[in-house]
UniProtKB/Swiss-Prot annotation:
Placement of Pumilio repeats on the sequence: 108-143, 291-334, 382-419, 524-562, 563-600
Upper classification of the organism: Eukaryota, Fungi, Dikarya, Ascomycota, Pezizomycotina
Protein's gene: NOP9
Organism: Paracoccidioides brasiliensis (strain Pb18)
Protein name as it appears in the record: Nucleolar protein 9
Family annotation (Pfam families): PUF_NOP9
Location of the region described as Disordered in the Swiss-Prot/TrEMBL record: 1-24, 477-496
Length: 678
């Protein structure tokens, strides 16, 4: 078959043509030349400008707004990742060995602190280091961050490092303040950067953020840091159930426990702060809302990021600066609610009514209800809530605000509120919205309100049958179905089951018909159901409270404890059931024969109990070693003749000191310069 005629050397000729077009080989390289516009904007970096090119009328883009601190190389990443794993394992033999390791990591990280803080893989190491650092190390790291806080608090990973640094530095501000007042000097080797007090370092960090509060207020990451700084300056608890959800999300992971570091108890308590902090707090709060009008402030009330900051601002203003601050026309509360009379169709009243049903704004309304002055709260309740509290309690979102309102009502107002809510009990039970009912019971116990009508309403809602009543309240059928499946019930417990368990626990605290509703139901179920309740991690708390609370009568305890005969060993080896076995000890304080029967069951299964972690705890709590060796002493404890704190056999038998103990005491006394014991 004939072939097409082709010219030899066509590829070489095409290559020569390309070489003729580009005569300068340096143009191919990524280098800036004098013929090209020297702008950082890539649109200006062109290898060739054609004749038909028309330049755009735009300014060069400035890329220097967010600094880039560089990346860790592969070896550094491997080293710091390995160090992070060692800190999390926390398998150091001594604290000294751990402190030496931490200091070596700090030496390796010297000059790379900002890179580590901004690294996705190594920022967690920085948090762990801060959690285990000494005061001088915290000061040293704090001073390295000075000058960069405005950028760090807006960074996805570095912002967490800043929060961790502020939390652990705040623990030592009070102690430094006391030492400064008593003119004591630390005998520590500190470099020039750690000569600054933490008070001064905090003030420097805040000064860096000044002028940017309005933007940072709603910034995704920086807003968390602002909330934390408000708590630090105000001296409010930093790790508290009431503040944790405002500072961080529910997914926030605290690494201090993972590295075996115990936080100062003062972190969960109100702290004394320097006078300069109070001045900085007032200035910071004023600057945060200075450029915002009232309309924008109200818009922040429903903003997912700005709302928590607004909550803290309002809480600090009313609790830290005094209730009289609310009378100031420039106060945050008056700017949000300027109308003092709360007229029905007024702007302030409509704003507060809208917050009831908003999933974000209702949290701000809870803060207002909790911290507002009494005069404002009484007016708010009288005009906006009292006649509508029943309809508010029906709503899933407004119900949380109703709970806060019930906490502040007097006895008479609480009784009238309960009368308004009683018709809504049945629909609330049907929808498993039990928080308002639980709050009614708890506040009724505190205020001394008769809860008989509420018990009758609950009996009507759950039914007269005791077995179906406890099944509906604790959602036992769903729990049994989940336990029969592949997924354990501990991982799939529903919110309805949790709320039902909390309601039952609240009912057990009330003397009278409410506690009898739960107790009669527990007595009516079968033994298998009772054991399944004891082994459920959520509803087992109901059984524990039923056995130990003062509302538990001797007749009820005698009937319920006998149901566990033959099941004690099985429960003692279960993670949740073991707590029920522990509760059976005080429940049988006047039932010695029942307690001895349970002890015999534990002795029979001694080997299995000793091989189990929870089993060993039950063995120790029941003082079974004493039961085997000194039965008389054990019976004395079981009858309550001995102090319940002396259950430990070592505390019961006061043995004379051995020779080695005496030698240790003499050595310790000699080291302290005191007289040796005889």
């Amino acid at each position: 078959m004939p072939r097409d005629k082709q010219k030899r050397g066509r590829r070489a000729e095409a290559k020569r043509k390309r070489d003729d077009v580009i005569t300068d080989p340096t143009v191919l390289k990524r280098q800036k030349s004098s013929d090209v516009c020297n702008y950082p904007n890539p649109s200006y970096e062109q290898l060739e400008i054609r004749g038909d090119y028309i330049p755009l009328d735009e300014e060069p883009v400035d890329y220097t707004g967010t600094p880039f601190y560089g990346l860790l190389d592969i070896e550094e990443q491997e080293y710091f990742s390995h160090a992070s794993g060692l800190l999390e394992l926390n398998q150091f033999e001594t604290e000294e060995e751990k402190s030496i390791f931490i200091e070596r990591v700090y030496e390796e990280a010297n000059g790379k602190e900002l890179k580590i803080a901004c690294s996705q893989s190594c920022s967690r190491l920085m948090e762990k280091l801060i959690s285990a650092s000494t005061v001088s190390q915290i000061k040293r790291l704090f001073s390295k961050f000075i000058g960069h806080f405005l950028n760090l608090v807006q960074h996805r990973f570095a912002s967490h490092c800043c929060e961790c640094l502020f939390i652990h530095a705040a623990q030592h501000v009070t102690s430094e303040m006391k030492k400064k007042s008593s003119k004591e000097k630390e005998n520590l080797e500190e470099d020039s950067t750690s000569e600054l007090q933490l008070e001064d370092l905090f003030l420097k960090a805040i000064s860096e953020l000044e002028g940017n509060w309005g933007y940072l207020l709603t910034e995704r990451f920086a807003s968390h840091t602002i909330r934390l700084l408000l708590l630090v300056l105000a001296g409010k608890p930093l790790r508290n159930s009431s503040t944790t959800t405002v500072i961080a999300s529910r997914k926030k992971e605290y690494l201090a426990s993972k590295v075996g570091t115990q936080l100062d108890p003062s972190i969960s308590e109100k702290r004394a702060v320097p006078t300069s902090f109070n001045k900085a707090l007032e200035k910071m709060m004023k600057d945060l809302v200075a450029g915002l009008d009232n309309t924008y402030l109200r818009a922040l009330a429903t903003h997912p990021v700005g709302n928590p900051v607004l909550q803290l601002l309002l809480s600090v203003e009313l609790s830290h600066m005094g209730k009289s601050k609310a009378k100031d026309p420039d106060s945050l509360l008056r700017r949000l609610v300027p109308d003092e009379n709360l007229q029905g169709d007024g702007e302030s009243a409509n704003f507060l009514k809208g917050l009831f049903y908003d999933p974000v704004g209702s949290r701000l309304l809870e803060t207002i209800v909790q911290d507002a002055p009494g005069k404002f709260f009484r007016l708010f309740y009288k005009i906006l809530v009292r006649e509508r509290i029943g309809s508010f309690s029906r709503n899933e979102i407004a119900g949380h605000v109703v709970v806060r309102i019930l906490e502040r009502l007097s006895k008479d107002d609480l009784k009238s509120a309960m009368d308004m809510i009683l018709p809504e009990v049945a629909p609330l039970v049907e929808r498993s919205r039990l928080t308002v009912i639980k709050a009614l019971i708890e506040r009724g116990i505190v205020r001394g309100v008769d809860l008989g009508p509420l018990a009758a309403a609950l009996l009507s809602a759950y039914g007269d049958d005791a077995v179906s009543r406890i099944n509906n309240m604790l959602k036992l059928q769903r729990s049994n179905q989940e336990s029969d499946g592949t997924t354990s019930s501990s991982n799939t417990s529903s919110p309805e089951q949790l709320h039902g368990s909390l309601l039952a626990q609240a009912m057990l605290k009330s003397t009278g018909p409410l506690s009898e509703l739960v107790q009669s139901s527990l007595l009516a179920v079968t033994t298998e159901t009772l054991i399944s309740i004891a082994q459920d991690p959520v509803v087992s708390h109901v059984l524990q409270d039923a056995l130990t609370l003062p509302t538990s009568t001797p007749q009820f305890r005698r009937q319920i404890t006998s149901r566990f005969s033959g099941k004690i060993a099985e429960l003692a080896l279960h993670s949740s059931g073991s707590h029920v076995v522990d509760a059976l000890w005080p429940a049988t304080k006047d039932l010695l024969f029942v307690k001895q029967r349970f002890a015999e069951e534990l002795v029979v299964h001694e080997r299995a109990l000793r091989d189990s972690f929870v089993g060993r705890a039950v063995w120790r709590n029941w003082s079974m070693d004493l039961y085997k060796r000194k039965r008389g002493s054990w019976i004395a404890i079981a009858k309550g003749l001995e102090d319940s704190t002396d259950i430990n056999p070592n505390a019961l038998t006061h043995k004379p000191k051995s020779n080695i103990d005496l030698a240790r005491a003499r050595f310790a006394a000699k080291a302290n310069g005191s007289k040796a014991p005889s």
